[in-house]
């Protein structure tokens, strides 16, 4: 793991973000060898940690994206982790990679799971509201009020209402509504 990480880092230094710099194709034989070894090391680290991606993806299943889409996004996060991993810091790679994988998946869910995309900061704020609400419900034994949630988050009730309003789901104008003739639509 450490050796593979060092080889990837050497490749990243020689190349520009893992890609051979088109302007400077004149590498020495040793540099070409280092790049080749670095690419193989990157590939080995990616393959060795795909099970981690799948296990993280299963935790986010049912939150707006299919499992395969989550695995794909997690693989992009894993690739970023492989490229940025610094083995000299003493952390295990899987611990480091977990953060990048999870970050990639949560961003994808925030950006792709809704008809109208919410900004990431709003999605994160909404997630923290849900977490505080769950924690308070567990602590109080009942669903907390908006005032209790706002106090726990140290924000105004108006700000809480604003975030919750922006996060409401959308409805299609072609959705049928209960009408006398059975042919009424929301857009009518």
Predicted regions and their residues:
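Alpha-helical promoter-recognition and RNA polymerase-docking modules of transcription initiation factors
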Residues: 1-117, 121-135, 139
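Charged, low-cysteine interdomain linkers and short loop/connector segments
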Residues: 13, 110, 123-188
